[in-house]
């Protein structure tokens, strides 16, 4: 593909409006050609030149559309991605990849058989704080990490009337937030030996998981992943302890908030996180504590990599094989919680 890659976006809810549409439009070599939506006015208010169609099938049947992006309710990921692949399109699916592991494996096999690129939007690989932490560990600054703790805590005590908080397949924060944390952990440390997971519905009227606490066990390391909707006080985003020192970071990557506020790309100061982490290093009897500059986040890198992959100039940034690993952990975690047991990976 030497001309612009024409993208069809399914739906125009929060994920499409906040993440996918502006990131696609801000990526040289990509063109948001059409959106399937029942609310043409909403789409046109943001992107007047973009065509709006009533049904996803119109995108699948359009020979000029190269790539289909699917940021729809989780239980629709599988049928929509399957239909798009069968229509010969390349596909990006928002996380979580699917609702079940078997669905994820079926899509991967279909993409391989059709020779299409299938990628999953695990955008938090490009969070400011995660990129900073990844660099710290790669450089060995903390030594051998023995304890890694990652929180995604919010204060939303009232259950809202939206699909993510209803009781359907793929709802709740084990499917919404945990995939981010699981993906980051695997990026840093690989797959664990075993998992111990607690899932709960703690808010009055909750119909889906609004609390999770997962312990991923490695031979010389424990990884704790935690999420709740009932944390009024600020929690540390990361707490990492190693043989040479520790790193603690508060606050969330700023990119989502800026995109939500309608900022457009590119911008020179994109991704800058004004909150430093705290690095504590110990050598002998000397203990040194310093603020550690947070690297800029880079969500635009995902779609730039998708462009390059479709043009044959680079690798798929998040191939289905990696997203399948997340689905394995999602399902194993649910079994662990159900049986109140520590379960080993197969």
Segments from the language model and where they lie:
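C-terminal helix-rich "cap/oligomerization" subdomain common to oxidoreductases
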Residues: 1-4, 67-69, 264-265, 291, ...
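Beta-loop-alpha module in the N-terminal Rossmann-like domain of NAD(P)-dependent dehydrogenases
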Residues: 50-109
């Amino acid at each position: 593909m030497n001309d612009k890659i024409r993208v069809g976006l399914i739906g125009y809810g929060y994920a499409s409006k906040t993440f996918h549409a502006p990131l696609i439009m801000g990526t040289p070599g990509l063109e948001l050609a059409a959106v399937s939506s029942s609310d043409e006015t909403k789409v046109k208010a943001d992107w007047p030149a973009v065509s709006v169609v009533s049904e996803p099938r119109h995108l699948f049947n359009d020979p000029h559309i190269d790539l289909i992006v699917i940021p729809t309710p989780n239980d629709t990921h599988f049928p929509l991605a399957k239909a798009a692949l069968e229509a010969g399109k390349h596909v990006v699916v928002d996380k979580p990849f699917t609702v079940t592991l078997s669905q994820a494996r079926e899509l991967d096999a279909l993409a391989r058989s059709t020779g299409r690129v299938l990628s999953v939007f695990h955008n938090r690989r490009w969070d400011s704080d995660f990129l900073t932490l990844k660099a710290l560990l790669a450089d060995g600054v903390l030594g051998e990490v023995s304890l890694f703790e990652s929180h995604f805590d919010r204060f939303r005590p009232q259950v809202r009337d939206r699909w993510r908080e209803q009781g359907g397949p793929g709802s709740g924060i084990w499917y919404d937030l945990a995939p981010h944390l699981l993906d980051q952990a695997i990026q840093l440390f690989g797959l664990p030996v075993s998992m111990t997971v607690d899932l709960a519905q703690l808010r009055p009227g909750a119909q889906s998981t609004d609390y999770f606490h997962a312990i991923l066990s490695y031979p010389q390391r424990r990884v704790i992943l935690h999420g709740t909707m009932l944390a009024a006080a600020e929690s540390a985003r990361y707490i990492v302890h190693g043989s040479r020192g520790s790193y603690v970071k508060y606050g969330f990557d700023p990119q989502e908030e800026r995109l939500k506020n309608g900022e457009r790309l590119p911008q020179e100061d994109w991704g800058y996180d004004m909150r430093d982490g705290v690095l504590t290093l110990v050598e002998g009897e000397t203990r040194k504590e310093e603020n550690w500059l947070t690297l800029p986040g880079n969500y635009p890198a995902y779609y730039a990599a998708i462009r390059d992959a479709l043009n044959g100039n680079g690798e798929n940034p998040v191939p289905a094989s990696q997203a399948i690993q997340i689905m394995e952990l999602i399902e194993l975690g649910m079994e662990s919680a159900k049986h109140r047991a520590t379960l080993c990976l197969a």
